[in-house]
Regions:
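Short, structured surface patches at the beginning of a domain
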Residues: 24, 28, 44-46, 56-60, ...
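Enriched for short, Lys/Arg-rich terminal
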Residues: 68-110
Length: 110
């Protein structure tokens, strides 16, 4: 499969903030990107080409359930966008209407 993985400004801001608290996050993300190159639709399908990916936090021993959530948007064609990221210890979930608004701001208005 030949496609690009791009990050949104919001995702980059989220990662920068989380890296201050979780020093192994960059290593975890490198591993995830390698996996995404083989399967861009990995994770839980939320509809409309939006996926929620569970990522284990290697900085703490909590497994995937207490790790990170990454929202990705697979633009049919050749681009996978990493839209936003949050820690389960900070936020339980993200609402559908909030997610649609974020995707519109971060991707559709480019």
């Amino acid at each position: 499969m030949n496609f690009k993985i791009e990050t949104t400004p919001r995702f980059e801001k989220d990662v920068k903030k989380l890296c201050k608290r979780f020093p192994k996050l960059k290593e975890d993300l490198i591993q995830l990107i390698t996996e995404l190159k083989n399967d861009p639709t990995m994770g839980t399908h939320l509809g409309n080409n939006i996926y929620k990916i569970r990522l284990q936090n290697s900085s703490i021993s909590s497994g995937k359930s207490g790790g990170f959530r990454i929202i990705s948007y697979y633009f049919v064609g050749d681009t996978l966008y990493l839209v936003t990221m949050y820690s389960k210890s900070d936020r339980e979930t993200i609402l559908d209407n909030e997610l649609k608004k974020i995707i519109q701001q971060e991707i559709n208005e480019r």
